[in-house]
Amino acid sequence: MGISDRLLGKKNVNGKPHIEAVVPAAALPGGEVRIIGSGLKPPELRRPRVQFGEVEGAVVIAADDFVIARVPDGAVTGPVVVSTNGSVSNGHEVRVAAPIAENLHPVANPALDAEGNIYVTFSGSRGQKVPVSIYKIDTNYAVKPFLSDMMNATAIAFDRAGQLYVSSRHDGTVYKVAPNGTMSSYAEGMGVATGIAFDREENLYVGDRTGTIFKIGRDRQIYVYATLEPSVSAYHLAFSPAGVLHVTGPTTSSYDVVYSVDSHGTVSVSYRGLGRPQGLAFDVDGNLYVAASLGGKRGIVRITPDGKASLVVSGQNLVGLAFAPGRSAILATQSAIHHLSWGIQGKSLLD
């Protein structure tokens, strides 16, 4: 490529806008993406137009070689194009998460049963009794009340038999919940119980956000497994494909960490540099996905096994995620649930 081509953009020698990439390649409505290319800004200080399918998105920043645009409500997965001076660029696919339920209050990952039904909390503020604690969203995205008698339902997990467990940060208890929505106490006395996760042997791990990870054996014996820096909100737990427990817990720092905890309870820093990291999940290749901020941008951050982090989904107010059938993901914000066709195979939570 010659100097003039580099200045003009190799594929923009005819003066038309050209898109080379969109980063990140997935977003929720309201999330911002960076469109990279050439000829993207018209002359005379006018702004380009950005279309996500049939819906126009707001332009936040525009330059000749990039445009930052906000994904509008109503956008769906499909091509984004940039228009300048009557010329329209090539299309470049952006995957847009589709809203499936709102008026909720999840504070951690949603959970899916073996049939693909989604379970999500309406957690409420500390000590607030709400009419419905957990909602069930079926495969047709019909939302129905599932559990009504729990204060501050926080984290949800299923064991290998399909039994549902829920933590309550109000009373430090983990409850078993039957398919008909009746509940019974499984383990008590765990402080401010937040995140929960099962290991391969079906021991249950519970994060008390004041600084302790508890391990509950299948005989219901409770052990102190590890101690961590306290969190201002909650611990979130997930096991890697190698069977190593990973924990996030937002603090007052803007440079928070992901912890790894080995089988002996020894705590290490797996990654440092996230803002308010919350729910987390692994794919089958060992990449870790965290609802967090990276470099001031909120969304889903992917951390590779060798420690490289990048924002792969843009979206405000994300608190958690769960991989779903069909190489997709369920994304939870502070008030809603979205479905994203992502092309990523999630790790089974009990393998």
Model-identified regions with their sequence ranges:
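Blade-level signature of beta-propeller repeat domains, shared across WD40, Kelch, NHL, RCC1
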Residues: 314-351
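Short glycine/acidic-enriched loop and turn motifs that connect beta-strands
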Residues: 41, 124-128, 171-172, 211-212, ...
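Surface loop/turn motifs at the tips and blade-to-blade linkers of beta-strand repeat domains
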Residues: 99-105, 145-150, 185-190, 225-230, ...
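Beta-rich catalytic cores
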Residues: 106, 130, 149-152, 170, ...
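Residue-level detector of Asp-centered blade-edge/turn motifs that repeat once per structural unit
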Residues: 112-115, 158-161, 198-201, 239-242, ...
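Ser/Thr/Pro-rich low-complexity tracts
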Residues: 1-119, 131
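Conserved beta-propeller blade signature
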Residues: 117-121, 163-166, 203-205, 244-248, ...
